[in-house]
Amino acid sequence: MKKLEAGYPRFFLHPFVKRLFAKATEEIAEAGKRAIVFPHKRAAQRAQRYVERTLAVATRIASYDNGMQALVVPESAIGVAMEYWRFTGEVVSSRQAQAHLSDSVVEGGSAVILKQQLAETTGAELDDHFLYESGMAGIFSAYRAILNLFPSKKTLQLEFPYVDALKVQERFGNGVVFLYDTEGEDFDAAVRRIQEGEFGAVFCEIPSNPLLRTVNLPRVAEACHQGGVPLVVDDTVATSLNVDVLQFADLVTTSLTKWVSGVGDVMAGMVTVNSQSQWASEFRSFLKDDTNGGSRLYTEDCRVLISNMKNFGERVSRCNVNGELIAEYLNAHPAVGRVWYPKFNTPHEYQLIRRDSGGYGGLVSFTLKQPRKMPKVYDALELCKGPSLGTEFTLASPYTMLAHYYELDWAEACGVSPNLLRLSVGVEEGEVVIGALARALDHA
């Protein structure tokens, strides 16, 4: 761990961001206090409320540079302040921090170009795309848009989601009802509660991460329509090239950090409004105000993403082929206990929203018949390893251990094994990845 220089930016500060925080602390913080820099004033204000509500301590906000704002907190409150940074994704990017540290001036104007490229993949109107500094920032904004409409209602989360998508609903509103398995009588009961208008919104991922399960989206959408409940769908794992969820959802959230970027060198998020939603006008108004006109994404990050998107379609198509190949290989391997992939798990539900030209995606999860051997298999795996997904190179992650280390028993009770290994399959020759897996699985 001492040799680890960086990690996922919401969990581990990038060296440039560390330097930015240190500089701000030196310039504006009193003795015994620290400064955390946020990209804009409203984020700092929300973080301030979160810290003061959680710890009942005094904090203050100071203007910093180029619209950034610093939240000054006691040393004892730094952990809680960084919880806000992690959960909400309202973060300063490494490029934004670097620009400040080097006194660089960056002109804007790239957001419209990026939206044009994205609109070609989603089918939505240009002005119905709203850009954020991270995928979680987009989810958090969508959640606050829901609270703006229904301030006293809980939300409903269907299927086991990405860790912080659930944390946001647990910590920043009225609570959440969580149904991790949308098959059987419990799902039928949840649908009835949706039809009765009990919830402020229904959240789900298509497919879920890391179990790659797909909820029956047409059925949920119909129940939401009957009950007057907004439906928020995250299509990050599948991408808008493989599935069309906008026909059912009121809002679609997407982490552009993943497959859209494909390189792992930029963070960004997006919320897309369904123009046919009965709340389209309210959502547009809220999101436009929240993004200061349509985009909060730092200009240089925007430019990098535009460049990365050039081979988006070709890359996703290749990952679809490789993902299916790897999933089939693992499914037939004698040492593998179970494989999660949209082709194998809830396949009917996935087909309901799959595009004619779409595939099953490049994300695969699996366990071993002898789970305790997974550490040896992981150590022997000659592939890149890390916590993200959607890169053009194959990336292996001991997902549960990284995302749910402090709640392993809870995750396992929800069907997510602590020994689960998640593969984000890249564009390499499929046989190269299979060869690496075969050698590693010799240790199983």
Placement of each model-derived feature along the sequence:
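Conserved small-domain helix->loop->beta segment predominantly found in fold-type I
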Residues: 1-62, 308, 324-395, 402-412
